[in-house]
Amino acid sequence: MCTSIVYSSNNHHYFGRNLDLEISFGEHPVITPRNYEFQYRKLPNKKAKYAMVGMAIVEDNYPLYFDASNEEGLGIAGLNFDGPCHYFPEVSGKNNVTPFELIPYLLSQYTTVAEVKEALKSVNLVKINFSEKLQLSPLHWLMADKTGESIVVESTLSGLHVYDNPVHVLTNNPEFPGQLSNLANYSNIAPSQPKNTLVPGVDLNLYSRGLGTHFLPGGMDSASRFVKVAFVRAHSPQGNNELSSVTNYFH
């Protein structure tokens, strides 16, 4: 289970994710310095303009990032997207990037979401495994920059899609437009006590604080997590310093 959030507090922006699995892949913090030359399967080798740091495993001296941010504040997290995810054969005239190359391909060269959106117009996510042992993972990506702007990138049977992300969160399935549409089912949820519209004029006993969240999903499934984290992020207080902001983020 994966959940990723872009949290803003006092003109600072915090980016991260969790990876709740019962196994470990041996991932650990990995720094890739400026001028490191990335080798691409279908593109010329290219040196990194920007350093990056994130969680990765390293195979054959190549960092396979789960998520990372570069020195200019651009961050990307890859989350499980099993089912809708679809990668493609090589396409002539496109920049054919394998999914495991996407994070370094973008973080090594770009600094803003606007630049990434422009670069993705010419990208085809090509179905090439890293190795026989390391097969491709079905992923979609949350990307955000230091302004707090964020997008979601999904490769499905209908092509590569780039969505502006007004709620600045991402979980897993279904496809991002479906996750946004589902939020309408919970639009009456509020952090305040509800107004009695059931039987107006009757003095109902609001027996507990938090009744405005009574129908907030509590499941660990991806659709429930999306609703819950979108609500919590939207109503989280801003920290009055960096420590309190980081604490709020982890909550």
What label would you give each PLM region?
Residues 96-129, 242-250:
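Proteins synthesized as precursors that undergo proteolytic processing into mature forms
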Residues 113, 117-153:
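Aromatic- and glycine-enriched pocket-lining scaffold segments that form the walls
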Residues 16-18, 151-157, 163-166, 171:
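Short amphipathic beta-strand/extended segments with alternating polar/hydrophobic composition
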Residues 24-42, 160-189:
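A short, surface-exposed interaction/processing loop segment used at functional sites
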